[in-house]
């Protein structure tokens, strides 16, 4: 007499969730619409980030798509003005959502926070390939002003496994970057405050903000 197959467990243990770095896809429609759409995407991303942090967990792949739609506040100065016609509700919503420190940082970023298009980033990686950079687990790449990490969203396949590092001054932006790239080593602080050893990176690339502000660096 044949034995019956064993019954599967009533509540099989779910597969453990392993956080992975976000990968850009045109299917996600990350950068649609005008100023109001960008504002709404930013707000949803911030609310998602704060919920994730309150629950002390890592973003799911679906939440990463929401977070990746955060484009910062460049060109959205109206959201920070109580006198901008048509932006009254957005102004109130933003004041209520952000802490005082987050709000001030976001308002300051309206003239500097413009993120780099993925296609432009791909051209920069092609230049790296022509220079002979091969990547690998013993190689290190740094983005010193990474924003939410667009440069790592289109990292070429041959560079997967390369150690990734990033620095971002803005708190909200840097915390989103950490959720999007949990496999990277990201510091949320001013670049002058990060303690990297000299000559410790194989590649430094990015599109950092340009300004005439002088920064104090205790080492120099």
Identify what each model region corresponds to.
Residues 1-220:
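Class I S-adenosyl-L-methionine-dependent methyltransferase catalytic core
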């Amino acid at each position: 007499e044949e034995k019956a197959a064993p019954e599967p467990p009533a509540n099989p243990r779910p597969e453990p969730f392993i956080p992975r770095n976000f990968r850009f896809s045109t299917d996600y429609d990350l950068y649609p619409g005008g100023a109001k759409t960008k504002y709404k995407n930013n707000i949803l991303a911030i609310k998602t980030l704060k919920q994730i942090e309150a629950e002390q967990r890592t973003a799911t792949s679906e939440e990463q798509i929401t977070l990746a739609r955060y484009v910062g506040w460049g060109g959205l100065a109206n959201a920070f003005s109580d006198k901008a016609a048509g932006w009254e509700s957005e102004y109130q919503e933003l004041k209520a959502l952000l802490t005082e420190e987050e709000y001030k940082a976001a308002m300051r970023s309206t003239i500097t926070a413009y993120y780099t298009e993925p296609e432009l980033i791909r051209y920069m990686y092609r230049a790296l390939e022509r220079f002979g950079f091969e990547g690998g687990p013993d190689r290190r790449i740094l983005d010193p002003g990474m924003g939410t990490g667009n440069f790592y969203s289109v990292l070429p396949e041959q560079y997967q496994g390369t150690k990734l590092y990033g620095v971002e001054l803005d708190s909200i932006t840097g915390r989103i970057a950490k959720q999007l790239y949990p496999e990277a080593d990201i510091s949320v602080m001013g670049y002058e405050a990060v303690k990297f050893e000299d000559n410790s990176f194989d590649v430094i690339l990015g599109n950092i903000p340009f300004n005439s502000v002088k920064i104090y660096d205790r080492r120099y």
